[in-house]
Amino acid sequence: MSKPTIAFLGATGGCINACLAHTLQTGYHAVALARTPSKLTALLRTQNIDQETLDSRLRIVTGDATDPEAVKSTLLLQPGFPTDPTTSASSPTPTLVSHIISGIGATGNFRGWCFEFDQPHICEEATRALLTALRNIYATYPEFMLPANVKSRPLLTVLSGMGVDPSQKQMDVPFLLRRVYHGLLHVPHADKWVMEEMLAKREAREFFRGVITVRPGSLLTGDHMLGSGYGYEKVRVGTEREEPSVGWTIPRADVGEWVFREVVVMGGGRWVDEKVTLTCW
């Protein structure tokens, strides 16, 4: 059985870069959207991904995640494309990627005692572009929206964050960390929450065969390098529906490995429509 093709948005970020590296190392095919492809390939080479693997298993689309056309090019696999094992040149209809894994988010820098963020609405804008891209694809290929073809629609996994829910239904941030955490991160948290709300709407839900929202703890420690975290076995997992995993932090490499193992390898079925919290300590 051929392995599915995975689309990555925000793959130059630590968590998703680690997930992409695992994906390529284990023989999956991937399509990644990147504003600067050379930056992405340089990061992957630091993960010991060789040029042959990059050439044979990865297609990079140059563009911005806020551009619906660039996103559309990332999601739609043309017949016979080398990195798509599910289609053949004889098939007249493109297919969609099996999974979309997105780690889009603003980048912050300290200015005095505050964090300043380069794109405070990037999650909202990227989510709007993703939905627009899929709306255009489904308008061109309405067969994807037939009830019988729901499994041909992509499974979406997005990285959000602990503490983004303004109603705080579940206190998923340790008590001693809450004031500082919300004070420093209120801008990206508001943006992540808008993203979650957009994906919860009925039309958006119909565009995917499921949505998995991953809410990691603080990502202020660790980098994207495989093996630099505590390891998959050390990750504590909870859900908003039952009980979140309350903790201080989790390395980026561990988030990427968890998404790879649970979503790419195992298919993600256990976590569909869940808001999954991840911590290590």
Swiss-Prot record:
It is an enzyme of class 1 (oxidoreductase). GO terms for molecular function: oxidoreductase activity. Pathway: Secondary metabolite biosynthesis. Disruption phenotype: Leads to a reduced accumulation of pyranonigrin E. Induction: Expression is positively regulated by the cluster-specific transcription factor pynR. Transmembrane segments: none annotated. It comes from the Eukaryota. One of its GO terms (biological process) is secondary metabolic process. Its EC number is 1.-.-.-. Keywords: Oxidoreductase. Oxidase; part of the gene cluster that mediates the biosynthesis of pyranonigrins, a family of antioxidative compounds. The first step of pyranonigrins biosynthesis is performed by the hybrid PKS-NRPS synthetase that condenses 6 malonyl-CoA units to an acetyl starter unit, to form a 1,3,5-trioxotetradecane-6,8-dienyl-ACP. The enoyl reductase (ER) domain of pynA is likely to be functional during the first two rounds of polyketide chain extension, to generate the saturated C-C bonds of the alkyl side chain. PynA subsequently forms the amide bond between the acyl chain and L-serine. Belongs to the avfA family. This is Oxidase pynE. It comes from Aspergillus niger (strain ATCC MYA-4892 / CBS 513.88 / FGSC A1513). The gene is pynE.
